[in-house]
Amino acid sequence: MPVTAMCLQDSKKLKKAKLTRKKVTPFPFSRMVLCLSLVFTLYVEATNARCLRPRSKELLCGSELVDILQFICGPTGFYVSKGASFRNRNRPGIVEECCFCGCSVAILESYCAAPVTNFTGREEQKS
């Protein structure tokens, strides 16, 4: 077999090999929009899912939250737990409860500090 015939046969084999490759089709824009909208919807639903009970109408955030806590707790004051990492908390923080989900007076009262007691067990009066 002559060399030119071998080269022609090899080139035909290469052309066939090139033709058998799968073509990568571009991802259609409509599918990309659909996927992104699904991801966004899942994100929104996940953020709403952190409210385990139905949302109340009143959302309290920032200075409004502090003012209402001072009003409800009175002279005993209030506390916000510190140092607990997000994963180790057994209950959401006051901001998650009242600012994102809305909270009731009972939840606000649960953040009031306990009255200061002296060693006789009687409640001290603050002036």
Curated annotation (Swiss-Prot):
InterPro entries, A to Z: Insulin-like, Insulin-like_sf, Insulin_CS, Insulin_family
Record region (D): 114-121
Endpoints of the signal sequence: 1-49
GO MF annotations, alphabetized: growth factor activity; hormone activity; insulin-like growth factor receptor binding; protein serine/threonine kinase activator activity
SMART domains: IlGF (SM00078)
Keywords for this protein: Developmental protein, Differentiation, Disulfide bond, Growth factor, Neurogenesis, Secreted, Signal
Disulphide bond pairs: C61-C99, C73-C112, C98-C103
GO BP terms, alphabetized: generation of neurons; positive regulation of activated T cell proliferation; positive regulation of insulin receptor signaling pathway; positive regulation of MAPK cascade; positive regulation of transcription by RNA polymerase II; positive regulation of vascular endothelial cell proliferation; regulation of muscle cell differentiation
Listed name of the protein: Insulin-like growth factor 3.L
Gene, per the UniProt record: igf3.L
